[in-house]
Swiss-Prot record:
It catalyses: (2R)-2-phosphoglycerate = (2R)-3-phosphoglycerate. GO terms for cellular component: cytosol. NCBIfam families: pgm_bpd_ind. The modification Phosphotyrosine is found at residue 35. Mn(2+) 1 binds at residues 402, 406, 461. It holds the Pfam family iPGM_N. This is 2,3-bisphosphoglycerate-independent phosphoglycerate mutase. It comes from Bacillus anthracis. Keywords: Glycolysis, Isomerase, Manganese, Metal-binding, Phosphoprotein, Sporulation. The gene is gpmI. The keyword Ribonucleoprotein does not apply. Mn(2+) 2 binds at residues 11, 61, 443-444.
Length: 509
Protein backbone atom coordinates (compact mmCIF):
# COMPACT_ATOMS: atom_id res chain seq x y z
CA UNK A 1 0.00 0.00 0.00
CA UNK A 2 1.33 3.43 -0.96
CA UNK A 3 1.05 6.20 1.64
CA UNK A 4 0.41 9.23 -0.54
CA UNK A 5 1.61 12.72 0.29
CA UNK A 6 -0.91 15.06 -1.31
CA UNK A 7 -0.79 18.79 -1.88
CA UNK A 8 -4.34 20.14 -2.10
CA UNK A 9 -4.49 23.65 -3.55
CA UNK A 10 -7.81 25.39 -2.87
CA UNK A 11 -7.47 27.99 -5.60
CA UNK A 12 -8.59 31.45 -4.45
CA UNK A 13 -9.22 30.44 -0.80
CA UNK A 14 -7.82 33.25 1.36
CA UNK A 15 -8.30 33.91 5.07
CA UNK A 16 -9.74 37.12 6.50
CA UNK A 17 -11.30 37.72 9.91
CA UNK A 18 -14.01 40.13 8.78
CA UNK A 19 -17.06 38.21 7.55
CA UNK A 20 -18.63 40.99 5.43
CA UNK A 21 -18.32 40.06 1.75
CA UNK A 22 -16.31 37.00 2.81
CA UNK A 23 -17.67 33.87 1.11
CA UNK A 24 -15.00 31.71 2.77
CA UNK A 25 -16.10 32.82 6.25
CA UNK A 26 -19.83 32.70 5.51
CA UNK A 27 -19.83 29.26 3.88
CA UNK A 28 -20.53 26.10 5.86
CA UNK A 29 -17.25 24.20 5.65
CA UNK A 30 -17.16 21.56 8.38
CA UNK A 31 -14.29 19.63 6.80
CA UNK A 32 -11.86 22.53 6.46
CA UNK A 33 -12.78 23.89 9.89
CA UNK A 34 -12.40 20.43 11.39
CA UNK A 35 -8.92 19.93 9.91
CA UNK A 36 -7.90 23.46 10.96
CA UNK A 37 -8.88 22.70 14.57
CA UNK A 38 -7.54 19.14 14.67
CA UNK A 39 -4.19 19.38 12.85
CA UNK A 40 -1.10 21.61 12.89
CA UNK A 41 -1.80 24.76 10.88
CA UNK A 42 -0.45 28.20 10.03
CA UNK A 43 -0.90 30.84 7.35
CA UNK A 44 1.36 31.71 4.41
CA UNK A 45 2.01 34.94 2.52
CA UNK A 46 0.93 34.56 -1.12
CA UNK A 47 1.40 38.07 -2.51
CA UNK A 48 3.96 40.81 -3.05
CA UNK A 49 7.67 40.31 -2.64
CA UNK A 50 7.13 36.91 -0.96
CA UNK A 51 6.20 35.53 -4.41
CA UNK A 52 8.49 37.72 -6.53
CA UNK A 53 5.95 40.45 -7.25
CA UNK A 54 6.15 44.15 -6.41
CA UNK A 55 5.30 45.00 -2.80
CA UNK A 56 1.56 44.98 -2.18
CA UNK A 57 0.77 43.27 -5.50
CA UNK A 58 -1.89 40.57 -5.20
CA UNK A 59 -0.85 37.05 -6.10
CA UNK A 60 -2.42 34.97 -8.85
CA UNK A 61 -2.65 31.35 -9.94
CA UNK A 62 0.35 31.36 -12.28
CA UNK A 63 2.60 33.05 -9.73
CA UNK A 64 1.31 30.88 -6.90
CA UNK A 65 1.88 27.57 -8.67
CA UNK A 66 5.32 28.64 -9.93
CA UNK A 67 6.45 29.51 -6.41
CA UNK A 68 4.90 26.40 -4.84
CA UNK A 69 6.39 24.04 -7.43
CA UNK A 70 9.80 25.71 -7.49
CA UNK A 71 10.24 25.78 -3.73
CA UNK A 72 11.73 29.27 -3.91
CA UNK A 73 10.73 32.85 -4.64
CA UNK A 74 10.37 33.11 -8.41
CA UNK A 75 10.80 36.66 -9.62
CA UNK A 76 7.83 37.27 -11.86
CA UNK A 77 7.68 38.73 -15.33
CA UNK A 78 6.00 41.87 -13.97
CA UNK A 79 8.97 42.52 -11.72
CA UNK A 80 11.50 41.66 -14.45
CA UNK A 81 9.93 44.09 -16.92
CA UNK A 82 9.58 46.82 -14.29
CA UNK A 83 13.27 46.51 -13.44
CA UNK A 84 14.22 46.58 -17.15
CA UNK A 85 12.25 49.82 -17.60
CA UNK A 86 13.74 51.37 -14.46
CA UNK A 87 17.31 50.49 -15.42
CA UNK A 88 17.02 51.52 -19.08
CA UNK A 89 17.39 47.98 -20.46
CA UNK A 90 13.82 47.88 -21.81
CA UNK A 91 14.53 50.34 -24.64
CA UNK A 92 17.61 48.36 -25.69
CA UNK A 93 15.71 45.06 -25.94
CA UNK A 94 16.73 43.44 -29.24
CA UNK A 95 13.28 42.12 -30.12
CA UNK A 96 11.65 45.53 -29.62
CA UNK A 97 14.41 47.19 -31.62
CA UNK A 98 14.06 44.64 -34.44
CA UNK A 99 10.29 45.24 -34.69
CA UNK A 100 10.81 49.02 -34.73
CA UNK A 101 13.54 48.78 -37.37
CA UNK A 102 11.26 46.61 -39.54
CA UNK A 103 8.32 49.05 -39.58
CA UNK A 104 10.57 52.08 -40.11
CA UNK A 105 12.29 50.47 -43.10
CA UNK A 106 9.02 49.30 -44.67
CA UNK A 107 6.90 52.30 -43.71
CA UNK A 108 4.39 49.99 -42.01
CA UNK A 109 2.59 50.15 -38.66
CA UNK A 110 3.43 48.99 -35.15
CA UNK A 111 0.49 47.46 -33.29
CA UNK A 112 0.49 47.17 -29.51
CA UNK A 113 -1.96 44.80 -27.98
CA UNK A 114 -2.65 43.50 -24.55
CA UNK A 115 -4.74 43.90 -21.42
CA UNK A 116 -5.17 47.59 -20.59
CA UNK A 117 -5.12 47.79 -16.79
CA UNK A 118 -2.80 47.99 -13.81
CA UNK A 119 -3.99 44.64 -12.45
CA UNK A 120 -0.50 43.20 -12.86
CA UNK A 121 -1.79 39.65 -13.34
CA UNK A 122 -1.60 39.34 -17.12
CA UNK A 123 -0.09 42.70 -18.02
CA UNK A 124 0.58 46.19 -16.74
CA UNK A 125 -0.37 49.28 -18.69
CA UNK A 126 2.95 50.91 -17.70
CA UNK A 127 4.67 48.42 -20.01
CA UNK A 128 2.52 49.61 -22.92
CA UNK A 129 3.28 53.21 -21.96
CA UNK A 130 7.00 52.36 -22.06
CA UNK A 131 6.47 50.96 -25.58
CA UNK A 132 4.72 54.17 -26.67
CA UNK A 133 7.62 56.23 -25.32
CA UNK A 134 10.13 53.93 -27.04
CA UNK A 135 8.26 54.21 -30.36
CA UNK A 136 8.23 58.00 -30.05
CA UNK A 137 11.94 58.10 -29.22
CA UNK A 138 12.73 55.91 -32.24
CA UNK A 139 10.57 57.98 -34.59
CA UNK A 140 7.87 55.40 -35.36
CA UNK A 141 4.93 57.32 -36.80
CA UNK A 142 2.17 54.73 -37.11
CA UNK A 143 1.47 53.15 -33.71
CA UNK A 144 -1.92 51.60 -33.00
CA UNK A 145 -3.36 50.27 -29.76
CA UNK A 146 -5.66 47.24 -29.61
CA UNK A 147 -6.91 47.45 -26.04
CA UNK A 148 -8.23 44.39 -24.22
CA UNK A 149 -10.43 45.62 -21.37
CA UNK A 150 -10.04 43.93 -18.00
CA UNK A 151 -12.82 44.19 -15.38
CA UNK A 152 -11.67 41.00 -13.72
CA UNK A 153 -8.28 41.54 -12.09
CA UNK A 154 -9.49 45.08 -11.39
CA UNK A 155 -12.97 46.54 -10.82
CA UNK A 156 -15.63 45.60 -13.39
CA UNK A 157 -16.17 49.23 -14.53
CA UNK A 158 -12.69 50.77 -14.51
CA UNK A 159 -11.81 50.87 -18.23
CA UNK A 160 -12.38 54.61 -18.61
CA UNK A 161 -9.63 55.47 -16.12
CA UNK A 162 -7.14 53.31 -18.08
CA UNK A 163 -8.20 54.85 -21.39
CA UNK A 164 -7.72 58.32 -19.86
CA UNK A 165 -4.25 57.36 -18.62
CA UNK A 166 -3.35 56.06 -22.09
CA UNK A 167 -4.57 59.25 -23.73
CA UNK A 168 -2.29 61.23 -21.41
CA UNK A 169 0.73 59.24 -22.63
CA UNK A 170 -0.40 59.58 -26.27
CA UNK A 171 -0.56 63.35 -25.69
CA UNK A 172 2.85 63.35 -24.00
CA UNK A 173 4.60 61.29 -26.71
CA UNK A 174 2.71 62.36 -29.81
CA UNK A 175 2.31 58.73 -30.92
CA UNK A 176 -0.45 56.14 -30.63
CA UNK A 177 -4.12 55.81 -31.52
CA UNK A 178 -6.76 53.39 -30.32
CA UNK A 179 -7.69 51.02 -33.17
CA UNK A 180 -9.85 48.35 -31.52
CA UNK A 181 -11.41 47.69 -28.12
CA UNK A 182 -12.29 44.18 -26.90
CA UNK A 183 -13.33 42.76 -23.56
CA UNK A 184 -10.90 40.08 -22.35
CA UNK A 185 -13.78 37.56 -22.48
CA UNK A 186 -13.21 37.57 -26.26
CA UNK A 187 -9.55 38.45 -26.75
CA UNK A 188 -8.11 36.39 -23.89
CA UNK A 189 -10.09 33.15 -23.95
CA UNK A 190 -8.01 30.12 -22.95
CA UNK A 191 -10.63 27.39 -23.17
CA UNK A 192 -10.79 26.90 -26.95
CA UNK A 193 -13.90 29.01 -27.38
CA UNK A 194 -12.63 30.09 -30.76
CA UNK A 195 -15.84 31.90 -31.70
CA UNK A 196 -14.90 34.56 -29.12
CA UNK A 197 -11.34 34.92 -30.40
CA UNK A 198 -12.58 35.11 -33.99
CA UNK A 199 -14.67 38.22 -33.22
CA UNK A 200 -11.58 39.92 -31.84
CA UNK A 201 -9.39 38.86 -34.77
CA UNK A 202 -11.91 40.11 -37.35
CA UNK A 203 -12.10 43.49 -35.64
CA UNK A 204 -8.31 43.82 -35.63
CA UNK A 205 -7.65 42.56 -39.17
CA UNK A 206 -10.80 43.38 -41.14
CA UNK A 207 -12.33 46.22 -39.16
CA UNK A 208 -15.46 44.10 -38.57
CA UNK A 209 -17.69 44.75 -35.58
CA UNK A 210 -19.48 47.64 -33.89
CA UNK A 211 -17.86 50.99 -34.77
CA UNK A 212 -17.20 54.02 -32.59
CA UNK A 213 -15.47 57.37 -33.02
CA UNK A 214 -13.46 56.86 -29.81
CA UNK A 215 -12.57 54.33 -27.14
CA UNK A 216 -14.56 56.39 -24.64
CA UNK A 217 -17.69 56.20 -26.80
CA UNK A 218 -17.31 52.42 -27.07
CA UNK A 219 -17.17 52.02 -23.28
CA UNK A 220 -20.04 54.44 -22.65
CA UNK A 221 -22.28 52.66 -25.15
CA UNK A 222 -21.44 49.24 -23.70
CA UNK A 223 -22.23 50.43 -20.16
CA UNK A 224 -25.52 51.90 -21.38
CA UNK A 225 -26.39 48.39 -22.60
CA UNK A 226 -25.37 46.74 -19.32
CA UNK A 227 -22.13 45.33 -20.77
CA UNK A 228 -19.07 45.98 -18.61
CA UNK A 229 -15.34 45.91 -19.29
CA UNK A 230 -14.64 42.17 -19.43
CA UNK A 231 -17.52 41.53 -21.84
CA UNK A 232 -17.28 44.53 -24.22
CA UNK A 233 -17.83 43.28 -27.78
CA UNK A 234 -14.77 43.53 -30.06
CA UNK A 235 -15.26 46.98 -31.56
CA UNK A 236 -13.55 49.11 -34.18
CA UNK A 237 -12.52 52.75 -33.72
CA UNK A 238 -13.20 54.71 -36.92
CA UNK A 239 -12.19 58.04 -38.43
CA UNK A 240 -14.65 60.83 -39.28
CA UNK A 241 -15.31 59.13 -42.65
CA UNK A 242 -16.18 55.87 -40.82
CA UNK A 243 -13.08 54.02 -42.08
CA UNK A 244 -11.14 52.07 -39.42
CA UNK A 245 -8.33 54.01 -37.72
CA UNK A 246 -6.16 50.98 -38.49
CA UNK A 247 -6.31 47.31 -39.36
CA UNK A 248 -3.41 44.85 -39.17
CA UNK A 249 -1.79 44.38 -42.58
CA UNK A 250 1.13 42.60 -44.28
CA UNK A 251 4.57 43.58 -42.94
CA UNK A 252 3.16 45.37 -39.90
CA UNK A 253 4.76 44.49 -36.56
CA UNK A 254 3.01 43.47 -33.36
CA UNK A 255 4.18 43.72 -29.77
CA UNK A 256 1.87 41.74 -27.49
CA UNK A 257 2.64 43.15 -24.05
CA UNK A 258 0.80 40.59 -21.89
CA UNK A 259 3.47 38.78 -19.91
CA UNK A 260 1.35 35.90 -18.60
CA UNK A 261 1.03 33.21 -21.27
CA UNK A 262 -2.14 31.23 -20.62
CA UNK A 263 -4.68 33.78 -21.87
CA UNK A 264 -2.38 35.13 -24.59
CA UNK A 265 -1.76 31.88 -26.46
CA UNK A 266 -4.97 31.54 -28.48
CA UNK A 267 -5.08 35.03 -29.99
CA UNK A 268 -1.31 34.87 -30.65
CA UNK A 269 -1.71 31.57 -32.50
CA UNK A 270 -4.24 33.10 -34.91
CA UNK A 271 -1.61 35.62 -36.03
CA UNK A 272 1.50 33.40 -35.99
CA UNK A 273 0.47 29.91 -37.11
CA UNK A 274 0.62 29.46 -40.88
CA UNK A 275 -1.45 26.28 -40.64
CA UNK A 276 -4.05 27.71 -38.24
CA UNK A 277 -7.33 25.78 -38.65
CA UNK A 278 -9.48 26.55 -35.59
CA UNK A 279 -11.62 28.92 -37.66
CA UNK A 280 -11.51 30.30 -41.18
CA UNK A 281 -9.53 33.55 -41.07
CA UNK A 282 -10.93 34.58 -44.45
CA UNK A 283 -9.07 35.92 -47.47
CA UNK A 284 -6.98 38.47 -45.59
CA UNK A 285 -4.36 36.75 -43.45
CA UNK A 286 -1.68 39.37 -42.76
CA UNK A 287 1.95 38.28 -42.88
CA UNK A 288 3.54 39.59 -39.67
CA UNK A 289 7.32 39.05 -39.87
CA UNK A 290 7.87 40.64 -36.44
CA UNK A 291 5.36 39.31 -33.91
CA UNK A 292 6.86 39.98 -30.48
CA UNK A 293 5.58 38.28 -27.33
CA UNK A 294 6.58 39.86 -24.03
CA UNK A 295 7.46 36.41 -22.63
CA UNK A 296 7.54 32.84 -23.97
CA UNK A 297 3.87 32.00 -24.49
CA UNK A 298 4.02 28.45 -25.85
CA UNK A 299 5.74 26.19 -28.37
CA UNK A 300 2.55 26.60 -30.43
CA UNK A 301 3.12 30.37 -30.87
CA UNK A 302 5.63 31.25 -33.58
CA UNK A 303 6.79 34.65 -32.34
CA UNK A 304 9.86 36.42 -30.99
CA UNK A 305 10.27 36.61 -27.21
CA UNK A 306 11.31 39.86 -25.54
CA UNK A 307 11.93 38.44 -22.05
CA UNK A 308 13.12 34.86 -22.41
CA UNK A 309 12.33 32.27 -19.72
CA UNK A 310 14.55 31.86 -16.70
CA UNK A 311 15.43 28.21 -16.23
CA UNK A 312 13.99 26.71 -13.08
CA UNK A 313 15.91 23.55 -12.29
CA UNK A 314 15.07 21.07 -9.54
CA UNK A 315 11.41 21.93 -9.07
CA UNK A 316 9.39 19.66 -6.78
CA UNK A 317 8.24 17.51 -9.71
CA UNK A 318 11.79 16.97 -10.92
CA UNK A 319 13.15 16.15 -7.45
CA UNK A 320 10.31 13.70 -6.78
CA UNK A 321 10.95 12.02 -10.15
CA UNK A 322 14.69 11.73 -9.43
CA UNK A 323 13.83 10.05 -6.13
CA UNK A 324 11.97 7.37 -8.10
CA UNK A 325 8.55 8.35 -6.77
CA UNK A 326 5.33 8.28 -8.77
CA UNK A 327 3.41 11.57 -8.96
CA UNK A 328 -0.03 12.64 -10.15
CA UNK A 329 -1.15 16.09 -11.29
CA UNK A 330 -4.92 16.51 -11.43
CA UNK A 331 -7.25 19.46 -12.11
CA UNK A 332 -10.08 20.58 -14.34
CA UNK A 333 -9.43 22.53 -17.54
CA UNK A 334 -9.28 26.01 -16.02
CA UNK A 335 -6.42 25.10 -13.67
CA UNK A 336 -4.78 22.23 -15.56
CA UNK A 337 -1.92 24.42 -16.90
CA UNK A 338 -1.24 25.54 -13.34
CA UNK A 339 -0.70 22.06 -11.84
CA UNK A 340 1.36 21.02 -14.87
CA UNK A 341 3.21 23.74 -16.84
CA UNK A 342 3.46 26.39 -14.10
CA UNK A 343 4.01 23.93 -11.24
CA UNK A 344 6.89 22.43 -13.24
CA UNK A 345 8.56 25.82 -13.63
CA UNK A 346 7.36 26.48 -17.18
CA UNK A 347 8.03 22.96 -18.47
CA UNK A 348 5.44 21.38 -20.77
CA UNK A 349 6.78 17.79 -20.69
CA UNK A 350 6.02 15.27 -17.98
CA UNK A 351 8.76 14.01 -15.67
CA UNK A 352 9.46 10.26 -15.46
CA UNK A 353 6.81 8.64 -13.27
CA UNK A 354 4.43 11.59 -13.66
CA UNK A 355 0.82 11.02 -14.62
CA UNK A 356 -1.71 13.73 -15.45
CA UNK A 357 -5.49 13.72 -15.30
CA UNK A 358 -7.49 16.50 -16.95
CA UNK A 359 -11.20 16.79 -16.21
CA UNK A 360 -13.09 19.10 -18.59
CA UNK A 361 -14.53 22.26 -17.08
CA UNK A 362 -18.24 22.74 -17.80
CA UNK A 363 -19.16 24.73 -20.91
CA UNK A 364 -21.02 27.64 -19.34
CA UNK A 365 -20.74 31.35 -20.10
CA UNK A 366 -19.62 32.18 -16.55
CA UNK A 367 -19.01 29.85 -13.62
CA UNK A 368 -21.41 31.58 -11.22
CA UNK A 369 -24.04 29.68 -13.26
CA UNK A 370 -22.47 26.37 -12.12
CA UNK A 371 -20.48 27.02 -8.92
CA UNK A 372 -19.57 23.35 -8.45
CA UNK A 373 -17.91 23.38 -11.90
CA UNK A 374 -16.42 19.87 -12.38
CA UNK A 375 -15.24 19.38 -8.78
CA UNK A 376 -17.23 16.19 -8.20
CA UNK A 377 -15.75 14.56 -11.31
CA UNK A 378 -12.23 15.64 -10.27
CA UNK A 379 -12.82 14.22 -6.79
CA UNK A 380 -14.21 10.88 -8.02
CA UNK A 381 -11.26 10.44 -10.39
CA UNK A 382 -8.74 11.24 -7.65
CA UNK A 383 -10.32 9.06 -4.96
CA UNK A 384 -10.23 6.17 -7.44
CA UNK A 385 -6.50 6.78 -8.04
CA UNK A 386 -5.79 6.89 -4.29
CA UNK A 387 -7.71 3.67 -3.66
CA UNK A 388 -5.71 1.95 -6.42
CA UNK A 389 -2.36 2.78 -4.74
CA UNK A 390 -0.85 4.33 -7.84
CA UNK A 391 0.97 7.44 -6.63
CA UNK A 392 3.38 8.57 -3.91
CA UNK A 393 2.84 12.28 -4.50
CA UNK A 394 -0.37 14.02 -5.58
CA UNK A 395 -0.79 17.62 -6.72
CA UNK A 396 -4.47 18.60 -6.82
CA UNK A 397 -6.13 21.91 -7.66
CA UNK A 398 -9.75 22.71 -6.84
CA UNK A 399 -10.62 25.68 -9.08
CA UNK A 400 -13.97 26.80 -7.68
CA UNK A 401 -13.18 29.48 -5.10
CA UNK A 402 -11.13 31.37 -7.68
CA UNK A 403 -13.16 30.88 -10.85
CA UNK A 404 -16.52 31.57 -9.19
CA UNK A 405 -14.95 34.16 -6.90
CA UNK A 406 -14.16 36.27 -9.98
CA UNK A 407 -17.90 36.87 -10.40
CA UNK A 408 -18.00 39.09 -7.32
CA UNK A 409 -21.30 37.39 -6.44
CA UNK A 410 -21.74 36.16 -2.88
CA UNK A 411 -24.31 33.39 -3.25
CA UNK A 412 -22.59 31.43 -6.06
CA UNK A 413 -19.19 31.89 -4.39
CA UNK A 414 -20.50 30.55 -1.07
CA UNK A 415 -21.80 27.53 -3.01
CA UNK A 416 -18.36 27.16 -4.60
CA UNK A 417 -16.67 27.17 -1.17
CA UNK A 418 -19.16 24.61 0.16
CA UNK A 419 -18.68 22.28 -2.82
CA UNK A 420 -14.92 22.61 -2.35
CA UNK A 421 -15.23 21.74 1.33
CA UNK A 422 -17.39 18.70 0.61
CA UNK A 423 -14.84 17.37 -1.88
CA UNK A 424 -11.89 18.28 0.33
CA UNK A 425 -13.39 15.96 2.94
CA UNK A 426 -13.68 13.06 0.49
CA UNK A 427 -10.09 13.45 -0.72
CA UNK A 428 -8.54 13.86 2.74
CA UNK A 429 -10.44 10.87 4.14
CA UNK A 430 -9.19 8.72 1.23
CA UNK A 431 -5.61 9.86 1.92
CA UNK A 432 -5.85 9.26 5.68
CA UNK A 433 -7.35 5.82 5.02
CA UNK A 434 -4.06 4.98 3.25
CA UNK A 435 -2.06 6.36 6.20
CA UNK A 436 -1.00 9.24 3.96
CA UNK A 437 -0.69 12.94 4.68
CA UNK A 438 -2.43 15.92 3.09
CA UNK A 439 -1.07 19.45 2.90
CA UNK A 440 -4.00 21.84 2.45
CA UNK A 441 -3.26 25.32 1.16
CA UNK A 442 -4.12 27.93 -1.49
CA UNK A 443 -2.24 29.88 -4.13
CA UNK A 444 -3.86 33.27 -3.37
CA UNK A 445 -7.06 34.77 -2.00
CA UNK A 446 -10.23 35.66 -3.90
CA UNK A 447 -13.44 34.22 -2.40
CA UNK A 448 -12.51 35.87 0.91
CA UNK A 449 -13.45 39.31 -0.52
CA UNK A 450 -16.45 39.36 -2.85
CA UNK A 451 -17.76 42.84 -2.05
CA UNK A 452 -16.12 46.23 -1.73
CA UNK A 453 -16.88 48.40 1.30
CA UNK A 454 -19.47 50.16 -0.92
CA UNK A 455 -21.20 46.84 -1.63
CA UNK A 456 -19.97 46.63 -5.22
CA UNK A 457 -18.77 43.28 -6.67
CA UNK A 458 -15.08 42.64 -5.93
CA UNK A 459 -13.84 40.54 -8.85
CA UNK A 460 -10.09 40.66 -8.21
CA UNK A 461 -7.74 38.52 -6.13
CA UNK A 462 -6.83 39.57 -2.59
CA UNK A 463 -3.60 40.03 -0.66
CA UNK A 464 -4.87 38.07 2.35
CA UNK A 465 -2.84 35.14 3.74
CA UNK A 466 -3.69 31.58 2.76
CA UNK A 467 -4.08 28.52 4.99
CA UNK A 468 -1.53 25.78 5.45
CA UNK A 469 -2.61 22.59 7.22
CA UNK A 470 -0.62 19.36 7.59
CA UNK A 471 -2.81 16.38 8.51
CA UNK A 472 -0.17 14.87 10.78
CA UNK A 473 -0.23 15.47 14.51
CA UNK A 474 3.42 14.85 15.38
CA UNK A 475 4.76 17.94 13.59
CA UNK A 476 5.00 21.58 14.64
CA UNK A 477 4.76 24.40 12.10
CA UNK A 478 6.49 27.77 12.19
CA UNK A 479 4.84 31.04 11.31
CA UNK A 480 5.94 33.60 8.64
CA UNK A 481 6.02 30.98 5.85
CA UNK A 482 5.61 31.73 2.14
CA UNK A 483 4.42 29.69 -0.84
CA UNK A 484 8.04 28.88 -1.74
CA UNK A 485 8.34 26.98 1.55
CA UNK A 486 5.71 24.36 0.66
CA UNK A 487 7.90 22.15 -1.58
CA UNK A 488 10.72 21.91 1.02
CA UNK A 489 8.05 20.94 3.57
CA UNK A 490 6.78 18.18 1.27
CA UNK A 491 10.33 16.90 0.75
CA UNK A 492 10.80 16.81 4.54
CA UNK A 493 7.66 14.67 4.88
CA UNK A 494 8.80 12.43 2.00
CA UNK A 495 12.30 12.03 3.45
CA UNK A 496 13.83 13.38 0.22
CA UNK A 497 16.83 15.70 0.33
CA UNK A 498 16.17 19.33 -0.62
CA UNK A 499 18.31 20.51 -3.58
CA UNK A 500 20.40 23.68 -3.27
CA UNK A 501 18.36 25.46 -5.99
CA UNK A 502 15.31 25.21 -3.74
CA UNK A 503 15.93 28.14 -1.42
CA UNK A 504 12.62 27.90 0.45
CA UNK A 505 12.68 26.59 4.02
CA UNK A 506 10.59 23.79 5.45
CA UNK A 507 7.65 25.02 7.54
CA UNK A 508 8.07 22.05 9.90
CA UNK A 509 10.05 23.13 12.96
Amino acid sequence: MRKPTALIILDGFGLREETYGNAVAQAKKPNFDGYWNKFPHTTLTACGEAVGLPEGQMGNSEVGHLNIGAGRIVYQSLTRVNVAIREGEFDKNETFQSAIKSVKEKGTALHLFGLLSDGGVHSHMNHMFALLRLAAKEGVEKVYIHAFLDGRDVGPKTAQSYIDATNEVIKETGVGQFATISGRYYSMDRDKRWDRVEKCYRAMVNGEGPTYKSAEECVEDSYANGIYDEFVLPSVIVNEDNTPVATINDDDAVIFYNFRPDRAIQIARVFTNGDFREFDRGEKVPHIPEFVCMTHFSETVDGYVAFKPMNLDNTLGEVVAQAGLKQLRIAETEKYPHVTFFFSGGREAEFPGEERILINSPKVATYDLKPEMSIYEVTDALVNEIENDKHDVIILNFANCDMVGHSGMMEPTIKAVEATDECLGKVVEAILAKDGVALITADHGNADEELTSEGEPMTAHTTNPVPFIVTKNDVELREDGILGDIAPTMLTLLGVEQPKEMTGKTIIK
